[in-house]
Amino acid sequence: LGWVFGKFNSLQNSMRRGYQWSLNRLVRIKAIVIGLFILSLGLTAWLYTSVPTSFLPDEDQGYFITIVQGPEGVSLNYTSKVMRQAEEEILKLPEVTGTFAVGGFSFSGSTANNGVIFTTLKPWHERSQSAQQIIGSLMGKLSAITEARVLPVNPPTIRGLGSFSGFQFQLQDRAGNSDLATMLEVMGQLLERANQEPDLQKPVYTTFAANTPQILIEVDRNRAKALQVDVNQVFNTLQNYLGSRYVNDFNFERRTYRVYVQADAQFRSNPEDIGKLYVRSATDQMIPLSDLVKLTPTTGAQTINHYNLFRSIEINGSAAPGKSSGQAIQAMENVAQQVLPTSFGYEWSGIALEEKTSGGQAPIIFGLGLVFVFLVLAAQYENYVDPLIILLSVPLAVFGALSAQSLRGLDNDIFCQVGLVMLIGLASKNAILIVEFANQLHEQGMPITKAAVQAAQERLRPILMTALSTLLGIFPLAIATGAGAGSRQSLGTAVFGGMLVATFLSLFIVPILYIVIGSLRDRFLKRRRPPHQVEEDGRVTTEIYR
């Protein structure tokens, strides 16, 4: 064991001598070092604007959703048949444990031509592919089902913010005077243009349709008046027989059940059955509805949505592989500016809305963190120069964090931004060790250059040890797998990359900054230092520095 410690100390001493040699060389070219530091500030600013932004990483939650949308007007049996075909394809995957299909249901309403399949996956450690990769492999297989649109999607990262991952774009009729045909035309142009964008995953789609087969029932009010039939009675009859109506409750085995009345299925399966219903007139005569109503086949929208009081159509999509949600949002906004007429507008909903509203807060929070640390350090050192020197090491950490995110293909999301705030303290810690010790030596009368070099040399070992412990502690987050891996990888990569780069560069940059800024302080503030005693060949001499 002693041999191991001896080798370790020998390595440390070699590193220390090499570091001292390098630092002495850099002191001679301070102007070049400062120039490179300013260049790194520019690179950091460029990285901050060029690294793709997003709100939250797309997580593997152990399941995914498959949306099934058949042609308008088809029966539930038709939809169920298509869903069984989709389930057969899904169950062929070795990563799948089971499926749960719900026909006649969609996240925008209950209709016979819609269905949803929930697919559960094996535990993360038992499969080699993530949910996103499985969804990508299923895209081509499920698109081969031509009887309906079958689309696998990831669930939303935060439950309640949207029905599935990606963005929700609300196309709005701002003027309020456009009919459905006009809205459909504008929507078609928007979708056609959006599906040509390289930043958007194909398809960008909507579940809205305005061609659902319907029956228009027109009541002949004059005829009803002549037969002394109340028009409200006609509407109530249609509601009771064709829809349903709540009557009362009853108790059975200590549970309460609701009672609804409705015509049996065989008596409301054809449009002609409407004419066979009867209403009572004021003279107690039973009048068939065939004498009072006119039936006209037509088409229309199953549901008409409104968003913030405007009639709207929801459009769904997601970022293309290798692109961020911020780039996808920007691409949709560019398409909307090119395509939408002046009477139409748009808004974001779901997680895209959260990303838009919170996107501008990250620089503010980071800036407040810098101000808070600066004020604390200013109170500790009783000046503003030392805190400035210390905080100038933070951009080095930001540069390392954003470089690591970019190299790994990760986005500047909320977890990366949390990591940047953490790096304010982690990067400042290394600079504090150098500045604190250099101040002590300088106040004893040692020249500022010699004080900075000696302080950096003396503090090398604690800086490396604390940085190494931090890097070893954060590294498992950077390579995390399983549940929540996306958020952990984003946070771990940002902190690991920032700490690694900041530790290495600050060892050379901070002493130079201390020398340059400290010299300017001493020159312009006329700061005097006490005499410094130097022992040389057994003789003690006193040097006075001004």
Question: Where are the model-predicted features located?
Answer:
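Signature of alpha-helical transmembrane segments and their immediate interfacial
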Residues: G2-S54, E536-R546
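AMP-binding (ANL) adenylation modules
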Residues: F105-S108, G160
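Hydrophobic transmembrane alpha-helices and their membrane-interface caps
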Residues: F372-R459, L464-A483, G497, V501, ...
